[in-house]
């Protein structure tokens, strides 16, 4: 099939999106944005800020020694896409059950950035539950809040809170901004957590995940040719041993590349973008939807001939393989 209808486009600009909440895809692990792709051009690298504790925030028995009180150290946290500082909160009250049964209270940072205690439903026995919103279990906390600790009591008699009553296991009792670990997928405009986020907020939803990002805008590269996607190659090496051979395989990711005729080789737009990480979109037939997406750092090698227009040989150094798209 002839490639005379082929077209190569490059990322010539972006559509920016300010810090806003991402949407849970439904599995509590993949969060979608409003963009199809995430740019990584200069000044446009995605910034992802899941709600959660960053530094400080230790919850300890009140230094005053007063019954039913805890102290919360000053802290920083991601809150609605902003890094917030929260002042120390001393002598914060914990409400015990009215009888000698188990009760769990969550120490939280509200959406307004202040400390608040959210009490769970009292048990009917001295047994605690790990199920949210159950009798004797931790509460579902408000959407937009951050849980930093739980305080567990099993008696109704006023007494100092002890260290043994305070629970701060990350992922169970404490929501951190850096847990679970996440990766950003520029080729799908999504954020992926390595484990599903706990559904501990009202309505059975996860903590909120915020991000700012930019979606690439594409422009056709005129007079381009010889596009090569970034693809993985495989090789085999062998070692001779007694009675036979042991083989091992290895893989490597090759550079993408293309060539183009230039106007003057100096003011051409593609030359102005050299050394940036850009998206490139290749259509084998510009009248059809299938295309190849490649994101990588643009390298250029210019040739200035005596009688011809300047030419450029471009490389695309990618972190991942090019992606084949049907539409």
What are these regions (language model features)?
Residues 110, 261-263, 317-321:
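Solvent-exposed residues in well-ordered beta-strands and their adjoining turns
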Residues 281-326:
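Short beta-strand and beta-hairpin "edge-sheet" elements
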């Amino acid at each position: 099939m002839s490639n005379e209808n082929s077209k190569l486009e490059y990322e010539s600009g972006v559509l920016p999106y300010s810090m806003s909440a991402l949407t849970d895809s439904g599995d509590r692990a993949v969060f979608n944005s409003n963009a199809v792709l995430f740019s990584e051009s200069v000044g446009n690298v995605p910034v992802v800020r899941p709600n959660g504790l960053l530094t400080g925030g230790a919850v300890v028995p009140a230094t005053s020694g007063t019954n039913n009180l805890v102290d919360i150290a000053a802290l920083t946290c991601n809150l609605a896409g902003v890094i917030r500082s929260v002042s120390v909160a001393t002598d914060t009250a914990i409400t015990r059950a009215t009888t000698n049964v188990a009760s769990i209270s969550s120490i939280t940072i509200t959406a307004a950035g202040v400390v608040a205690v959210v009490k769970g439903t009292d048990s009917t026995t001295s047994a605690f539950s790990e199920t949210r919103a159950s009798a004797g279990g931790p509460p579902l906390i408000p959407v937009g809040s951050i849980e930093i600790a739980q305080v567990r009591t099993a008696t109704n008699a006023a007494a100092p809170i002890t260290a043994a009553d305070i629970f701060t296991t990350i992922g169970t009792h404490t929501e951190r901004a850096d847990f679970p670990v996440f990766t950003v997928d520029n080729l799908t405009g999504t954020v992926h957590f390595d484990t599903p986020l706990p559904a501990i907020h009202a309505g059975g939803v996860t903590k909120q995940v915020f991000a700012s990002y930019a979606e690439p805008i594409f422009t056709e590269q005129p007079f381009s040719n010889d596009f090569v996607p970034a693809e993985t190659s495989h090789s085999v090496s062998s070692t001779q041993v007694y009675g036979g051979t042991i083989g091992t395989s290895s893989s490597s990711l090759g550079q993408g590349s293309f060539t183009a005729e230039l106007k003057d080789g100096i003011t051409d737009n593609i030359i102005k973008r050299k050394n940036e990480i850009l998206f490139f979109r290749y259509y084998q037939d510009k009248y059809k939807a299938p295309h190849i997406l490649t994101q990588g750092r643009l390298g250029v090698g210019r040739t200035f001939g005596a009688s011809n227009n300047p030419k450029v040989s471009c490389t695309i150094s990618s972190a991942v393989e090019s992606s084949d798209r049907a539409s």
